[in-house]
Amino acid sequence: MHEITARFATPAEIQEWDTHVIANPDGGNLLQSASFAKVKADYGWKPRYIVYEGTVDRGGERQSFASYSLAFEKNIPLLGKLWYFIKGPAVHDADELPALLQANRRLITEQKLGVFAVKIEPEIVADEHAQQVIAGTELVRTADIQPNDYTAILSTEGTEEEVLKSLSSRGRNAVRRATREGCEVKRVELTDENMRAMYALMDTVGQGKVSLLLRPYEYYRDFWRAFENAGQGRLYFTYEDGKPSVGAYVINYGTKGTYKDGGSKPRRKQYGDSHLVQWTAITDLMKEHGISTYDFCGTPPAAELKNKEHPYYGLGLFKTSFTKNVTDFVGVYDQPISELKYKLWNAGVERLMLRLWVKKHHYSFY
C-alpha cells in the first residue's frame, strides 16, 4: 500500500530546488526546474512548489518516497485556480499515482486553495499496466501539450565511440561525412544577435508542417538566458556563407541532456550539418556533465513513425536516425477537484480561453 502526503516546500527547500528535483524518482525534468519556474512566473503562471512524501511498496519492500514537483497556477475567471504539473509530478511508476492523486485532493481541500482542477503530465511509459492503473482513477485524458510526450531518447552511457556506433547507419554516416568535409560547429555566446538569429532559424524551416506556434522572441530569450545563467543551457550554430544555417539550444539537467529548441534554413549545401550539430552537443554534454541520456524532444508516437501524414513525420525521420528508441509517455490528464466547475471547464470554457488567448497573444496558453 502506498501512503503519500503533499505539502508546500519550505523556503530552504525552494532555495535548493534543483538538487531536490534531480533526486526525484524520474531523475528530474528541466520543465520542473528552478530556471523554468522563473520564466513561467514572468508569463502569467505562478509556480507552486509541492513536496510529496511518504512510503511506498516497491519489490515487496516498504521504501521512503519523496518527489519535488512544480505546479504552475493560473487563475481562471469564475472557476478558480488551475494547476498544471508540466512533465510531472515525478513518480517511479503508475502504481504510485492513485496515492498521489489523493494527496493532491487533501492538500487542496484542507487548505481551501480554490483549485478546481489539476492537470498532470507524468513521465510514465504508456504500457498496458500503466493504462490499466490510470483507467481505475478519476483522471480524464486530455490533449497533449508538450512536444516530447512521444520522443526519441538516446542512451549516452559508454564511450564516445560506443555511442557513435549505437546510432543508425544513416545518422552515423551523416556525422562522419560532415566531419570529413570540414563542417564546423560552434558553441556561441547568448548575445542578442545570436539569439535573434536562432529565433529566425526556428521560424524558417518546416515550422508550418509541424504546426508549431512560436512564442514571442522575448520568451525564448528569457528562457535561454535563465538556463544559461544556471549553467544548464547552451547554443550551437553551423554557418553557411558566413551566416548561421543550423542552430540548436540544448540543456543539461542532472544526468539528462535535452535538445530543447532547433531550427535550420532550407536547401543547405552541407550534408549532415544538422547531425553534426547534435553530435557535438551530445559529446560535449557527455564529457562536461556525464549525461546518461539525450532526449531529442518530440517525434510521432512509435506506431505513427512511418505515417507520412503525421505533422512530426520529418522530425521523426531525423531524430530516429540517432536512435530507434521512441518512448511513448502516458500524456496529459486532468484531475477534477470541483466536479461542477470542471464540467464547465471541459464543456467549453477551456477551448474558449485557449482561442481568446492565442488570438490576443499569438502563442500557446500553456
Segments from the language model and where they lie:
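Active-site/acyl-donor-binding loops of N-acyltransferases
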Residues: 3, 10-14, 24, 39, ...
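A conserved beta-strand-loop-helix scaffold within acyl/acetyltransferase catalytic domains
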Residues: 4-58, 67-78, 122-127, 134-149, ...
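Short, high-confidence coil segments that cap the C-terminus of an alpha-helix
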Residues: 45-47, 112-115, 290-291
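N-terminal cap/recognition module
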Residues: 77, 81-86
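A cross-family glycoside hydrolase active-site/sugar-binding cleft signature
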Residues: 86, 119-121, 260, 297
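The substrate-binding groove and active-site-proximal loops of carbohydrate-active enzymes
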Residues: 87-92, 269
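A gly/proline- and charged-residue-enriched helix-loop-helix capping module
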Residues: 90-133
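Aromatic (often tryptophan-rich) hydrophobic motifs at membrane interfaces
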Residues: 99-107, 221-343
